[in-house]
Amino acid sequence: MICCDKVLSSVQSMPVIDKCSVTKCLQTAKQAVVLALSLFAVFASGSLSILSAAVLFSGTAAVLPYLLILTTALLGCVYAVIVLLRSLSAVVQSCKKRSPEEIEGAARPSDQQESGGRLSEESASPQASPTSSTLRLESAFRSIGDSVSGAFDDINKDNSRSRSRSF
């Protein structure tokens, strides 16, 4: 995703950096950091749970500390996977919000002329089109993100109901 090099011309034909593209860059960088950290958390908590399970089932150590470590690591792994899926869904949704003109504008007209129209023939078939496969992938990630978001909404509603009953 290249978003920081977008330059618009103003009324006087002077190049001006679009402020919207700068915020898109910051959002994309933030999403990339969240993706990297959640992926690291998945690997770290997964390896910790495997190690603690190995020590726990070998029978050479006390059971309770490693049982607590195992449950904490598994819970951390589940939460890290949820965060990873939500951030992937957010990245896919932000990519989908890009207009088709921006995507088509990325292809240079000189490339289409050099290929002799072969590019337009290939893109006409639905199997050769890379956008159809990316749209399927985006819809899959969106449905995963929506289900995870719905699960969080249900949990928050249940928590607010239980708090209101306790007071």
From Swiss-Prot:
Phosphoserine: modified positions: S166
Organism superkingdom: Bacteria
Induction data: Cotranscribed with incD, incE and incG within 2 hours after internalization by host cells. Detected at 4 hours post-infection in HeLa cells (at protein level).
Region of interest: Disordered: 97-167
Membrane topology term: Multi-pass membrane protein
Ranges where the record places region Sufficient for interaction with human 14-3-3 beta protein: 94-167
Comp. bias (Low complexity): 122-135
Transmembrane segments: 33-57, 63-88
An example Gene Ontology CC term for this record: extracellular region
Site (Interacts with 14-3-3 beta): S166
Protein role: Inclusion membrane protein probably involved in early modification events of the chlamydial inclusion.
Stated name of the protein: Inclusion membrane protein G
Source organism (scientific name): Chlamydia trachomatis serovar L2 (strain ATCC VR-902B / DSM 19102 / 434/Bu)
